[in-house]
Amino acid sequence: GRDFPGWRAGKARRQKQVWQNQFPCSFYALRRTLEPNQKCSLFEMYGYVEERADLVQYCREPIGPQLFADAFREARVLTDTIGKRVETHTANPIFDAYCSYTYLDNCLRGGFPLLLGGKQVFYAFSRKHGDLERDYNYFTVKPEYYSQGNGNFRDINQNRRCDVSLSPFVGRSNIDLFFDLLQLDGYNPLQIEPETFVLAQEEQSALAQDCPVIHGLSGVLSSGFSAGQLWRALERNAASPKERELTFAKIIAAAKKQIHASFGEGYWSDHWSYDLDLIEDYLTVWPDREEKLLCDETLTWYPARAGITERCARYRETPNGLRQYNATYPLENSTAGTVEVDAQGNPLRSCLMEKLVLLCAIKYATLDAYAMGIEMEGGKPGWYDALNGLPGLFGSSMAESCELARLLEYTISALERLPHPFAMHREIRALVDELS
C-alpha cells in the first residue's frame, strides 16, 4: 500500500512522539504489503499509569492478541453484569436488549450504585454526557478504582429516578443528596463533583486496633480521600487481598461522606422538577415510611454562590426591544462552606416537608405576568439548550408550571396525611403567608 504523502512508517517512528491527547486514541505506523486474500490485524494499546513502576510491572506480562481478546471479553462481561440489574425476558429479544442498554446508558450518566462497607451508597462511573460532538460538555473521569466524573445536577438526577426500584439498597440517599443541594432561593448548583470521604482521628485510632495496616495510611486518611485513593493505598500496604478488602470496608463504613458541588453558570428553570420523581420512586417501594421521610429534620441547605439580580437591574432597553440580562451576581459568601448555618454557626437543618413547601412557594412566586409559565429568571432555560437565548427575551415555561402542579398536588396531599404539625423556619413561614 501507499504511505501517507511524504512519510514512511520507519521515518514516522523515529520522530519525537507525542504522549498526550484530548481523546482516548492514538496513531500507530506500520508498513506491510498484503497479497490477495491476506489480512493483517493491528493491535493498539494506550493508557495511563500513576507511576512508572506500574508500567514496568504491566509490561512484564505477555502482550499479544490473547491479551486484547481477554480485555474485550472482560469488557463484555462488565457491561452484561451491569445490565443484570434490569434483566428482562419477553417475547421480544430486541426489547429485552433495549432495557439493558438503556440502563447501561443511565449508569454512564447517573452512575452505577454500589454499597461499600455494607453502609455507604456509592455511585461509580457517573459523569457528563461528553459526546465528541458536544465538546462544551467537558468532563473528567479519574484514572482510579471506583472512578467518578463530574456531572450536571440534572444529568445525574434524571438518571437515578428509578434506582430505588432497581436497587432498593440506595434507600433515601438520592433524596438526601439532591435536597441537601437545594438552596434557600429554590435553586441549586449546576455541577456535582466526585465524592470524597473523611475519617475522624478517633475513628482511625479505634480501627487501628483491629486493622494495623491503617498506621501506614496516614498520608491518605489525613484529609478527604476518594474510594479509589483508599484502595490504591491498600494495594501498597495491605499484606493480602483479604486484609485489603476487610480494611477498605471498615474504613468506608466508619467514614463520613463529603459532597462537592460548584455553581457553574446560571440557574436552570427546571432542575428542581426531577426531585419529586425521587420521592415517588422511594414511596413506591416503601410507602409506609412516608411520615419519617417527610418529617425527619436531617436535611441541610446548600449556600448559594450567586444571587438572582433584581428586576430593575437586569431589564434593559435595546434597539431590538426590551431584554433581560445579567440574571445572577456573585455573593460575598461564594467561598463559604457546603451548608448554610444559623446565627450560632450551626448547620441549618430542615425536614423534607419544609423544603417541599418552600419549593412550592418560590416556584409559584416566579410565575410570569400571565400566571402561566415559570419565569427563566436565573438566566437559563430548561433542558433544551437551543433555547439559551429565551431568558433574555423574558422567556417562561409551561412545562415547569405543569411540574409545579404535580408538586403542589403531592405536597398538599402529604400535608393532609401527616398526623402532626412540623417545624418551619420563620422566614420560610413568612414567605408562604405573604403569598397566600
Show which residues each predicted segment covers.
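Acidic, mature catalytic/reactive cores of soluble proteins
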Residues: 1-436
